[in-house]
Amino acid sequence: SGFIKENEEAAGEGLFLAVRGPLSRQKLLDQGFKCPEIYGDPALLLPRIYNPLKNKQYKVGIIPHYIDQDNKWLDQFKDDPSINIIDILDPTVCNFVDEIKKCEIILSSSLHGIVCGDAYGVPSYWIKLSNKVIGKGFKFKDYFLSVKRNDKKPIIIKKNTKLDSVINHRLIKDYKIDIDLDLLYKVCPFKGIH
């Protein structure tokens, strides 16, 4: 739904109905494409398709990007009943959503962990577990602009970073997303798929 990195180019022809955010739109315009000023990651529409009631079971959900899943910092939480390590590669979207909804907050190095948290009203924060995720944060910044979040950079996680210091980090603050999801839904080409 958008570019991953700043120096990327669109491949071939395309009809653009919406894009992740204004940074992706500007890149398309600069490359000669037409692109309406309609923003939003399609995952923000998930609650219109699937929105079960779930009780909160975990203080924190951690969603590592697939490239970060073997990060040693995560090992300390494997047996902690208050922490839910959520697999971004879960092939069942419903299971993934259920696990997010069971958490009080989400810490994620995966953009879609943050997007899905936002979609379901679970406060979600960008963490950086490694330098392996490509794009220097371009897709995160693009998304944050689309929903009018003020996030500019991730919370850096190191091997000895304590979870309490992350939860109490100055970047962890209340926010509310602000985006016209009706407009995004109106142009959505996969309406009615359940």
Residue ranges with predicted function:
Residues 1-194:
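Active-site anion-handling motifs in enzyme catalytic cores
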